[in-house]
């Protein structure tokens, strides 16, 4: 599954960047304005340092809004407001359930999933070879960060049976 494979590759790269505090970011030409509720404001304030370490640069902009000025390069092709909203929602949902390390893992998984190539997207031969090579350089090429299989074994018997033999 090309989406799961790319997600695994991105996840391991981003997690390594996070551990080394080297997440690449891109400044936004037009900062994204986000209106927040009181609960969202509290969760942003609580996890402000974590958001910065993940490459999400956010600044207070009035009493109930923030502006996002930088995002991880990983997310450059995604709508900033949508992804930041999803991250805030994930923080609200998991803040009390997850330990800090698990919360970081969850957010890196979310960002990797959103940035990964989509299932069914056409890849030329060079892209396929590159993706497979990157996948086999990961620590866990069998499963995506969500736990879904990337590679499955299909025996000759399974193929023959599906062909009515």
Describe the role of every protein-language-model region.
Residues 1-165:
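Long, charged low-complexity intrinsically disordered regions
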């Amino acid at each position: 599954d090309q989406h799961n494979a790319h997600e695994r590759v991105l996840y391991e790269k981003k997690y390594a960047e996070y551990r080394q505090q080297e997440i690449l970011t891109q400044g936004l030409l037009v900062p994204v304005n986000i209106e927040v509720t009181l609960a969202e404001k509290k969760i942003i304030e609580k996890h402000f340092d974590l958001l910065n370490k993940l490459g999400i640069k956010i600044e207070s902009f009035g009493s109930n809004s923030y502006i996002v000025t930088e995002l991880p390069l990983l997310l450059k092709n995604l709508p900033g407001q949508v992804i930041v909203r999803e991250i805030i929602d994930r923080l609200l949902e998991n803040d009390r359930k997850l330990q800090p390390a698990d919360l970081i893992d969850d957010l890196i998984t979310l960002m990797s999933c959103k940035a990964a190539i989509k299932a069914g997207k056409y890849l030329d031969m060079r892209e396929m070879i590159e993706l497979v090579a990157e996948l086999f350089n990961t620590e866990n090429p069998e499963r995506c960060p969500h736990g879904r299989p990337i590679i499955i074994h299909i025996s000759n018997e399974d193929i023959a049976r599906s062909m009515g033999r």
